[in-house]
Design a protein with these regions (language model features):
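Phosphate-handling catalytic cores of nucleic-acid transaction enzymes
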Residues: 1-301
Length: 301
């Protein structure tokens, strides 16, 4: 667990010390942006490489020590206000923006009762869940490598969805969202892997030994590689997240500076065009915009 109140170099060193793994979890995004200060380059480079599990290296000049990890596994969870996004991701052009998943929370519009009837010890509940997950993770680690295998039909549905989204993003936002769509596909596959592995704990039939495991190893139950499938229900549940995540990303994009295009689309406009056919007339567009309470000028520009 790596502190966000850190420097870019410090974060890199912490990852090295834990053999390439780490989690950063902060409730205030400016804790990180203030701490890294002038070392933004180190922070950005580390996050971009960690997204693809790339090699990380570090050269300590004081004692001429060189450190390296061949694979990196870093998870980052931050919350904050729109104003706290820009210091962390000043622009969409260096690749850091497209590597993130965003969720823009709606404003609280009414008071909610702050008093509960139960007497649940929340800290204890989280400890129990943490211990349960650790035991599960230890068991999965001992079993070896799991590889997610999609069916041919799932391949077609996945490609159909992202092909349409990629085409639409190019028409509405130019090249700014192209990388985000591509990496959203990567993140969707990662979410499918997690959902599938959790489902396999309930239904062991979703996991089969890899076809290249020798018969002798199968007899001795020495199986280091497993093929994992995802149910159609779980597959479609994850795919249903793609469009909302794309819209949240386009909304956050509007907070960032741009030197590429003068006018960006909004999430509302993206959603409007997502509901239109590939070809449509002006009247139908304005009718749909009226239904969504989107100004005519917004729909037409």
């Amino acid at each position: 667990l790596i502190s966000g109140n850190n420097t870019g170099t410090g974060i890199l060193q912490n990852i090295m010390d834990s053999n390439g793994t780490g989690i950063i979890c902060e409730s205030e995004a400016d804790t990180v942006s203030t701490a890294i200060g002038t070392e933004y380059g180190n922070w950005s480079d580390t996050l971009r490489k960690a997204f693809d599990h790339d090699r990380l290296s570090y050269n300590r000049r004081t004692d001429r020590e060189y450190q390296e990890v061949s694979r990196s596994y870093l998870s980052v969870l931050l919350s904050g206000t729109p104003a706290q996004v820009k210091p962390l991701i000043p622009t969409a052009e260096n690749g850091l923006f497209s590597r993130q998943n965003f969720y823009y929370m709606p404003r609280v519009t009414q008071w909610a009762d702050q008093f509960g009837e139960d007497e649940v010890d929340v800290d204890e509940e989280f400890r129990l869940m943490g211990n349960e997950w650790k035991n599960t993770l230890d068991e999965l680690t001992l079993r070896g490598l799991f590889t997610l295998k999609l069916t041919h039909a799932q391949h077609k549905q996945f490609n159909f969805l992202f092909d349409k989204l990629f085409h639409r993003s190019g028409k509405i936002n130019g090249d700014e969202m192209s990388s985000s769509v591509i990496r959203l596909a990567v993140n969707a596959c990662r979410m499918m892997s997690i959902v599938a592995i959790l489902r396999s704990l309930e239904d062991p039939s979703l996991v089969k030994p890899d076809a290249h495991i020798s018969s002798d190893n199968l007899k001795d139950r020495i199986i280091p590689r497993w093929n994992l499938v995802i149910t159609d229900d779980d597959f479609h549940a994850v795919l249903a997240l793609v469009e909302p995540l794309y819209l949240h990303a386009t909304h956050v994009l509007s907070f960032l500076s741009s030197s590429v295009i003068k006018r960006r689309s909004t999430a509302d406009k993206n959603m409007l065009f997502a509901e239109m056919e590939d070809e449509f007339i002006r009247r139908l567009l304005l009718e749909k915009a009226h239904d969504r309470r989107i100004p005519e000028s917004t729909a037409l520009t």
